[in-house]
Swiss-Prot record:
This is Large ribosomal subunit protein bL35. It comes from the Bacteria. Belongs to the bacterial ribosomal protein bL35 family. It comes from Prochlorococcus marinus (strain MIT 9301). InterPro entries: Ribosomal_bL35, Ribosomal_bL35-like, Ribosomal_bL35_CS, Ribosomal_bL35_sf. GO terms for molecular function: structural constituent of ribosome.
Length: 65
């Protein structure tokens, strides 16, 4: 059987944890940040866990993570 290909776009966006979960960046932290509070920007700069409903799709895109 041939090797499974990794979707490079997904590999750049998601990182696997030691327990098999996937981490992702939060949205709304690229531009138009002037009117957002420091607390919100600090929160948006942290990583978030991919929801369990989406984790199966991420796992298919990154088979060797």
């Amino acid at each position: 059987m041939s090797k499974l290909k990794t979707r490079k776009s997904a590999a750049k966006r998601f990182k696997a944890t030691a327990t098999g979960k996937f981490m992702r960046r939060r949205a709304f932290h690229n531009h138009l940040l002037d009117h957002k509070s420091s607390k919100l920007k600090r929160h948006l700069s942290t990583k978030a866990v991919v929801d369990e409903r989406d984790a199966d799709n991420v796992k298919l895109m990154i088979p060797y993570a």
